[in-house]
Regions:
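Phosphate-binding P-loop
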Residues: 1-2, 64
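Conserved GTP-binding G-domain of TRAFAC-class P-loop NTPases and closely related GTPase folds
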Residues: 2-4, 8, 13, 21, ...
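Residue-level preference for the first positions of well-ordered beta-strands
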Residues: 2-6, 29, 70-72
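Anionic, Ser/Thr-rich low-complexity intrinsically disordered regions
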Residues: 4-6, 53, 97
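Conserved substrate/cofactor phosphate-moiety recognition/catalytic segment
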Residues: 16-69, 106-108
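Conserved beta-strand scaffold positions in the cores of enzyme catalytic domains, especially
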Residues: 28-30, 95-97, 143-146
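ATP-dependent NMP and nucleoside kinases share a basic, alpha-helical "lid"
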Residues: 39, 65, 77-118, 129-134, ...
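Amphipathic alpha-helical transducer elements in NTP-driven molecular machines
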Residues: 51-58, 80, 101, 120-127
């Protein structure tokens, strides 16, 4: 059964850096929502045509399943119902949630070095809105992994539920 790994965390937490490295090192298809904004709008900074962007994103996830491939999803998935959509809409995958936790100031600092900068007030709102995954809240996931990002050094992954994904059995260097 194909596996879906969904990255979860606030902008600037390190989701894209980590998911890109995992995908490259393990031959997993990486699907990032910002890449679909770039594809549809010609620029990842243009957050227009949202409906079309998400339709294309979800269609590519479905194509990944049809092809029997594993995928890693790079999106914020800040709240429970956003995360549940991946399980409800794509029930034929094994579902693995990877939460990256980082101090708010580090997220803001990382954000400043990105091409597509998220305003600080939006990052603050994300932090207020964030529902950190728990075994109780996110009980439908096959596994939940917690990773702390300290000064852009990812700490040893910990399991909240289930087993750690296989790619965390070795050191990941960015």
């Amino acid at each position: 059964m194909p596996k879906m790994y969904v990255m979860c965390g606030i902008s600037g937490s390190g989701k894209t850096s980590l998911s890109t490295k995992i995908a490259k090192d393990n031959n997993i298809k990486r699907l990032g929502i910002d890449d679909f904004y770039a594809k549809i709008n010609g620029d990842e900074c243009k957050h227009e045509n949202t409906f079309n962007v998400w339709i294309a994103f979800f269609q590519e996830i479905q194509n990944t399943f049809i092809n029997g491939e594993d995928c890693i999803i790079d999106t914020n998935a800040l709240v429970w119902h956003q995360r549940m959509q991946f399980i409800e809409w794509f029930p034929n995958f094994e579902h693995h949630l990877i939460f990256i936790d980082a101090p708010l100031e580090l997220q803001k600092k990382n954000n400043q070095s990105r091409r597509r900068k998220v305003p600080d007030d939006v990052i603050n709102k994300m932090a207020e809105k964030l529902q950190k995954p728990t075994a109780e809240l996110d009980k439908n996931w096959d596994s939940i992994t917690y990773i702390e990002n300290k000064e852009n050094v990812f700490q040893q992954p910990k399991t909240i539920k289930g087993n750690l994904p296989y790619f965390f059995n070795k050191e990941i260097k960015l």
